[in-house]
Each structure stands twice: as C-alpha cells, then as structure tokens.
Design a protein with these regions (language model features):
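A recurrent flexible, glycine/aromatic-enriched loop bordering the glycosyltransferase active site
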Residues: 1-22, 34-35, 191-192, 255-297
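Acidic donor-binding segment of Leloir-type glycosyltransferases
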Residues: 143-183
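Conserved donor NDP-sugar-binding/catalytic core segment of glycosyltransferases
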Residues: 1, 213-259
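A short, conserved alpha-helix in the catalytic core of glycosyltransferases
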Residues: 23, 33-59, 88, 220-224, ...
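C-terminal, non-catalytic tails of nucleotide-sugar-dependent glycosyltransferases
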Residues: 76-122, 234, 244, 256-284, ...
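Short aromatic/hydrophobic "clamp" motif used to bind/position activated sugar donors
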Residues: 206
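Short, well-formed alpha-helical segments that are part of the catalytic scaffolds
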Residues: 131-146
Length: 394
C-alpha cells in the first residue's frame, strides 16, 4: 500500500494509476520541467492534496519492457535522475520540509537526507549480562563510528555473575564519555529492563540497542535520528547483518509463519531486494528492538514495552504496532548498518529453557494481532509467500 518514504526513494507506483480529472486539471497536469519523471512528480503533487493513495493488491497490469524502457537498463534514459531529484526537491519545498535530495544506493533510486532541527540528545539503552567482549565491541563501535556527538549510553546491568564484569563496568566512565551503568535486580525480562533504563534517560530520543550489535556506518546515529525527529514517525530501524554478511533485519513483515518475520532475511549483504527494498528507505509495520530509535515522549506515552504479555519476544513489534495504529510511520533505513550477533547473551528461543515462554508470548501476540497476521500487512502483498520473508509469490 501507500508508503510515503518509499515513494521518496523511487517511483514504485510506476505507470498505472487512476485519479480524478478535476484534480489533475487543478494541478496543471504534468510539468514539462520534470519530463522523464513526470509521473513521479505528478504522484507527489496529487498525494499532497489527498494525503495518500489507495492500492488494489490484485494483479491487473503487465508492463512490456523494451530496450528503451527506463527499466531496460540504468542508462536507458539518463535524464530521468535529474528530473526525479527536481520533483523530490520541489515536493519538499511545497510541504515545508527541509532536506537534501541525493542519488540513492542504486541507480534510479534517491535519498532524502533530512535536516535535523536543533541538537537533540539520544539516550542509548543497552541491556547486559556478563559478555563484556560483546559489550566492548558494541561500545567501541558507537564511539568510533558516529558523527552525532550529543548522546549518552546507559548500560543496564541484569544479574551478571562474573566478577570481571563488574570490574569492567568500573572502567567505562573513564574510557567512554557520558557512559554509565544502572542496575536492574529482577529476573530477565527484556521489556522491564529497557523500561527501567528509560527512567534514567535524559535524551529526547531513545535508542534500544542489544549488546551484541556492532555499528558499521559512520552516520549511524544521525541517520536514525533524522527520521525519529519527524512528527509523523514512530520508530526507526536499521539494516542489520549476520556475521556472514547476510541480512538479519531490514524491516518486519506480519504474517510470516503465523507471527512475524524479517524482510529479506538471509539475503546477501550486496542484494538490492525486491524492487530495491533493501537499498531504499521503507515503511513497515514494525522494526526490530535489537536496534530501535523512538522519541522518548512516545515511549513514555505508550507505556514502553509490555512487561506482562511480551517479556522477551514480540515486545518490539507490539510497541511498533501500537504506534502504527495511531497513524505513525515506522521506518527502515538502509544507511544505518550494523552487525547483529543474534541473542548471544541469552541463547536462542528454540532452546528448551526458553521454548515454553516463547510459545506463550507467540500465542499472546497472535491473540492481539490476528487481523494483521492472517489477513493484512499493508507493506507485503497478499500474493507473496507467508512462509518465508523473500517476497516470493505463493
């Protein structure tokens, strides 16, 4: 369905669209100065008037591609990029938003680099139990690879048993500026731990971050923040890789295997994905809590993560869906990249000691969101397979 951030990266609507003649004439039709991307420009101007676009998920149209088509090769119409960037820049100007339109990560795609208003502070919340090697790698990557200086890190200690862990904590303030440790004494409950850490946060934005994350991109914090600051955005997620350079997370899809799954999971790092989805900003119903930025005001207003029904699993998706149900957008950006060493600190949910808890939380999730799991994810066509996250047809 309509995904506003995706439309700012490429004209995914393409050729077939229906709109009122009166509105078309009111807008003056197509603009010659955007020739080559005149349809993209028109869609942006139409949506400025209507607030969105309806979508029919049925297959009603086939595009016969020939050698001169835009899709026939990235050099088929070399003037298209300039026209598209003008259309996007004019759209930002008309809507009163500030940012720079740039070439995207792949030909025929684009990026809006949003200006950040003021100097907002980000509070990074990192739960930890022992595993100081992972935590050290995480912390070092944050300080060595960030172009945003106004942040604090709150390590949330939870029942470590190794004395070396506490000795390690003592070294943090002298090695990492504005880094402190707070102590959560209860049993492991990912939601409660993050909610506890958030009570100490001073920033206008919170970044929930697993201790097994290693930041890769230098504009990591700035990129996440540039979306989180927008009033229409609820949560922002990053592009996460497994250590073997395959995709771990690129947005969350509802309905995968009876619950939810990660878009393009296990695709190669270099893949562009279905219709450039891996290399363009996307709107999804949810993003993973392994790396999730949100406004502190929203986090508090929505009660943080659900400690009762989703102590460990699905709390991130539940939080995002609550935001989405209130009309906020959840965003995946491919320009905030990191490795995710997947749940090293507590073991995978398939292990016997976690299986019962996981199944209980999965049942809670299905009971609450059955309508989206069984019938409807606006960002995943119903003709796509719901057994895998690969955008393959059923």
């Amino acid at each position: 369905d309509y995904a506003p951030d995706y439309l700012l990266c490429c004209n995914y609507i393409c050729h077939l669209a229906v709109f009122k003649r009166a509105l078309y004439e009111q807008l003056g039709g197509e603009r010659p100065e955007c020739d080559g991307s005149q349809d993209h420009d028109l869609f942006l101007r139409l949506i400025e008037q209507t607030g969105g676009a309806a979508h029919l998920p049925q297959v009603l149209y086939y595009w016969r591609v020939h050698a001169g088509s835009t899709s026939g090769g990235t050099d088929a119409k070399p003037y298209v990029a300039a026209a598209a960037k003008k259309a996007l820049a004019d759209h930002l100007s008309r809507t009163g938003r500030t940012g720079t339109v740039e070439d995207g990560l792949f030909p025929s795609t684009y990026r809006v680099k949003w200006d950040i208003e003021g100097d907002p502070k980000v509070s990074i919340l990192i739960p930890n139990k022992d595993h100081t090697d992972d935590l050290e790698k995480c912390l070092y990557s944050i300080w060595s690879k960030t172009e945003w200086d106004n942040f604090e890190v709150i390590v949330i200690e939870n029942n470590s048993t190794d004395p070396a862990t506490f000795a390690y904590y003592e070294t943090l303030p002298s090695r990492f500026a504005d880094c402190r440790v707070v102590y959560y004494k209860g049993a492991f409950n990912f939601s409660a731990i993050n909610n506890f850490g958030a009570t100490f946060a001073e920033g206008e934005h919170l970044l929930l971050l697993n201790n097994d994350i290693e930041v890769l991109s230098f504009d990591f914090l700035r990129e996440l923040l540039s979306y989180s600051q927008r009033p229409d955005v609820g949560a922002v997620g990053a592009k996460l890789y497994y250590p073997d350079d395959t995709i771990q997370h690129a947005g969350v899809l509802m309905g995968i295997n009876g619950s939810a799954g990660h878009s393009h999971k296990s695709y190669p790092r270099t893949a562009v994905g279905d219709m450039y989805r891996l290399v363009t900003t996307q709107n999804y119903m949810a993003v993973t809590g392994a790396c999730l930025m949100t406004k502190a005001s929203l986090y508090r207003a929505f009660g943080g993560l659900d400690e009762e029904k989703f102590a460990v699993a699905y709390n991130d998706v539940d939080y995002c869906l609550k935001l989405w149900q209130k009309g906020l957008l959840n965003v995946y950006t491919p320009r905030a990249e990191a490795y995710h060493y997947e749940s090293k600190s507590r073991g995978l949910d398939t292990l016997s000691e976690n299986a019962k808890r996981y199944e209980r939380e999965k049942a809670n999730f299905y009971a609450k969101y059955q309508q989206y799991i069984d019938n409807y994810d606006p960002y995943y066509n119903p003709h796509f397979n719901n057994l895998f996250e690969n955008f393959g047809l059923k």
